[in-house]
Swiss-Prot record:
GO MF annotation: an example: transcription elongation factor activity
HAMAP family assigned to the protein according to its UniProt record, in alphabetical order: GreA_GreB, GreB
Keyword hit for Cell division: no
SUPFAM superfamilies: FKBP-like, GreA transcript cleavage protein, N-terminal domain
GO BP annotation list: DNA-templated transcription elongation; DNA-templated transcription initiation; regulation of DNA-templated transcription elongation
Keywords on record: DNA-binding, Transcription, Transcription regulation
Function in brief: Necessary for efficient RNA polymerase transcription elongation past template-encoded arresting sites. The arresting sites in DNA have the property of trapping a certain fraction of elongating RNA polymerases that pass through, resulting in locked ternary complexes. Cleavage of the nascent transcript by cleavage factors such as GreA or GreB allows the resumption of elongation from the new 3'terminus. GreB releases sequences of up to 9 nucleotides in length.
Pfam family, one: GreA_GreB_N
Protein name listed in UniProt: Transcription elongation factor GreB
Keyword Thylakoid found: no
Family indicated by similarity: Belongs to the GreA/GreB family. GreB subfamily.
Transmembrane portions of the chain: none
Length: 158
């Protein structure tokens, strides 16, 4: 089950997506469906078929975003978090081979399209929670345990 947390920036982006879909893209696609339907035979009308499918996709995403935004809890930065890994932190980690990664721990609905974001529900994020710089985090992976050292922790301050 995914944790219903989101950063303020993530919440605003989801709201922007919902507004764009509802106010701009959906009306445009609806016009295309109406135009294509006016041409007659809908069974062999590629414009009609494609835009009808796109309209269903938009409606599905709008329903999801509407429900999602109602249930999400915005987590803002708190000075008490400083120095430890919590939700919203940018974390730099390093393994024994010197391989480093930098990412932000965010809600499930914020990670899509971002390679530098990981979900709070991921094994890596769970292993890193409450760690400080210099601490060792042991992550259970399908290939076994992986050890990572925390190099840096940063927060986006309002």
């Amino acid at each position: 089950m995914k944790t219903p947390l989101v950063t303020r920036e993530g919440y605003e982006k989801l709201k922007q997506e919902l507004n764009y879909l509802w106010r701009e893209e959906r009306p445009e696609v609806t016009k295309k469906v109406t135009w294509a339907a006016s041409l007659g035979d809908r069974s062999e009308n590629a414009d009609y078929q494609y835009n009808k499918k796109r309209l269903r996709e938009i409606d599905r995403r709008v329903r999801y975003l509407t429900k999602c935004l109602e249930n999400l809890k915005i987590v803002d930065y708190s000075p008490q978090q400083e120095g430890k890994v919590f939700f919203g932190a940018w974390v730099e980690i390093e393994n024994d081979d010197g391989v480093t990664h930098r990412f932000r721990i965010v809600g499930y609905d914020e990670i899509f399209g971002r390679k530098d974001y990981i979900s709070i529900d991921s094994p890596m994020a769970r292993a890193l929670l409450k760690k400080e710089v210099g601490d060792l985090a042991v992550v259970n992976t399908p290939a076994g345990e992986a050890s990572w050292y925390v190099n840096a922790i940063e927060y986006v301050k309002p």
